[in-house]
Swiss-Prot record:
Modified residues (Phosphothreonine): 51
Region: Important for dimerization, residue numbers: 337-414
Lineage: Eukaryota, Metazoa, Chordata, Craniata, Vertebrata
Source species of the chain: Homo sapiens
Gene that this sequence comes from: NR2F2
Effect caused by changing residue 398 to R: Reduces transcription activation by 40%
Outcome when changing residue 205 to I: In CHTD4; the mutation results in increased transcription activation of the EGR1 promoter; transcription activation of the APOB promoter is decreased
Matching InterPro entries: NHR-like_dom_sf, Nucl_hrmn_rcpt_lig-bd, Nuclear_hormone_rcpt_NR2, Nuclear_hrmn_rcpt, Znf_hrmn_rcpt, Znf_NHR/GATA
Protein name, as recorded: COUP transcription factor 2
Documented effect of changing residue 228 to E: Reduces transcription activation by 40%
Residue ranges constituting the NR LBD domain according to the UniProt record: 177-403
Amino acid sequence: MAMVVSTWRDPQDEVPGSQGSQASQAPPVPGPPPGAPHTPQTPGQGGPASTPAQTAAGGQGGPGGPGSDKQQQQQHIECVVCGDKSSGKHYGQFTCEGCKSFFKRSVRRNLSYTCRANRNCPIDQHHRNQCQYCRLKKCLKVGMRREAVQRGRMPPTQPTHGQFALTNGDPLNCHSYLSGYISLLLRAEPYPTSRFGSQCMQPNNIMGIENICELAARMLFSAVEWARNIPFFPDLQITDQVALLRLTWSELFVLNAAQCSMPLHVAPLLAAAGLHASPMSADRVVAFMDHIRIFQEQVEKLKALHVDSAEYSCLKAIVLFTSDACGLSDVAHVESLQEKSQCALEEYVRSQYPNQPTRFGKLLLRLPSLRTVSSSVIEQLFFVRLVGKTPIETLIRDMLLSGSSFNWPYMAIQ
């Protein structure tokens, strides 16, 4: 945090160009009588007690002097970007810690953003996190300087090695953050990977239809239970929780499938989908096989990166906390949770895989392609035999509200 700290002056010192210079003409203040107890002086006291003449003359040590007025004025300076309380002058302008950190991060990482509206979004305390494009645009418009970020020295509150800065500027120790946040993500898993089923860990083993359906049910239930127990998610409004899971359940399912090395052989998947039960055109078979191929590709690409459990947990949190869900009551808060998860993953990868500088980027690049796996196809392949025509969104809502007491309509998970 860049703070403006005024150096302390003795009230008897002359202040050129101000009325404070009159203080030197005031009659000397008599010292304490002999034998009086000695009182230690502090910078706040500024030496002997101020006389009324000194106070009126503008001694900076007094509560009513111009130094105090200047400090009070500084405390009321607003951030030129969002209007929040300014913490000082950063990169050429008075800004809050949030806008300072956002501008610094955007410039140092050379980030580019896209506006989903008309590139004229309101940027204030309540909307500053909703459009990064317009926020950066306003930072530059009000005069924040890119070159000040590139050439400026590291401010005192810049996170050093072993620290991690949240978007509100509060530094946290990196290791305590990882051991806290990521460990909670890991502990939220209702099933360790090995408990998804022994067959799941044998990629070459062709699973039967019933085993495939049961494994899929476990993975979907695991995704919802995990979300219910991770930090911050239970604090969201229940409508927001449902909206987030309805949008992201299929992506979480693919990540779980990759994590447990779920076998994805075409024949049993087609059988599980019930496509053999009724005549179908060749085009429909080809279309389903193409969807299965896409699913297989996404799983294999994740497996090729040898993603560890902590990375999977962070990836799932990044996927879950998306502002793309419809009807969210607090979009900015959800975005901040996604950013925390992303930053935690970045710090973890840097500390655990220092010899793989591109690993973090490769992991993030896998996330957008998860949506290429159709959620309706996942329903058809894995859940029709279990729930029939019951919408998967209904099951997710029931799982979220029922918790561990949830039972499948047609098959209980043992």
